[in-house]
């Protein structure tokens, strides 16, 4: 499987934003038209987009659903995969997105609070449609928009969700997220080596070199947000770097 660079389109209050370490009000980027942003990434070569409804993740209300629907439609028309997370709390929430044409739904808090949901969705739609987000802070899992910490480690949870039917994992290192100070590949590598399903990395990418470092962990791809939006590097350069690595 080729390592993939996946642009993030994070939405809050109808805008495309980038937060520092997930903290509301810490926007370093705020753009008015998420659909235009998504189309721009597709035009620059993205094969997959990563959509997050931050209002859904933080407040449990999926306020950005109408915009997400438009972006999903655009992706389908252009043959681009799309993974969506944030505020997916129930089987019905997930099913409505998958029926809309979303390639993969990302379960965070809901999976950790109700692991059986992963099995139900995997049985109904196939494991490839189900991704579980493991967000780690100080080596422990964090939930509810990074506001609560759990006792379990990413490796423990990753193995459990693989058994329940998750087809992939999204691993975010909150310690480096949004800071653009570089990645810490150790925790990602540890998780990759502990499970047999693909692991997508996220958090802290600030340079093209970081992409190479994460590729070497065995991760299947990386979600990139702040570095692209603030011009640290272009998506075209990122795709080229990975192709030549």
UniProtKB/Swiss-Prot annotation:
Top-rank lineage group of the source organism: Archaea
What keywords are annotated for this sequence in UniProt?
Answer: Amino-acid biosynthesis, Cytoplasm, Histidine biosynthesis, Isomerase
Q: Which Pfam families match?
A: His_biosynth
Quick check: keyword Membrane in the entry?
no
- SUPFAM superfamilies noted in UniProt: Ribulose-phoshate binding barrel
Q: Name one GO biological process term.
A: L-histidine biosynthetic process
Reactions that this protein is recorded to catalyse: 1-(5-phospho-beta-D-ribosyl)-5-[(5-phospho-beta-D-ribosylamino)methylideneamino]imidazole-4-carboxamide = 5-[(5-phospho-1-deoxy-D-ribulos-1-ylimino)methylamino]-1-(5-phospho-beta-D-ribosyl)imidazole-4-carboxamide
**Record: active site:** 10 (proton acceptor), 135 (proton donor)
EC numbers for this chain: 5.3.1.16
Where in the cell is the protein located? Answer: Cytoplasm
The entry assigns this protein to a family as follows: Belongs to the HisA/HisF family.
NCBIfam families (UniProt xref): 1-(5-phosphoribosyl)-5-[(5-phosphoribosylamino)methylideneamino]imidazole-4-carboxamide isomerase (TIGR00007), PRK13585.1 (NF010112)
- Record's protein name: 1-(5-phosphoribosyl)-5-[(5-phosphoribosylamino)methylideneamino] imidazole-4-carboxamide isomerase
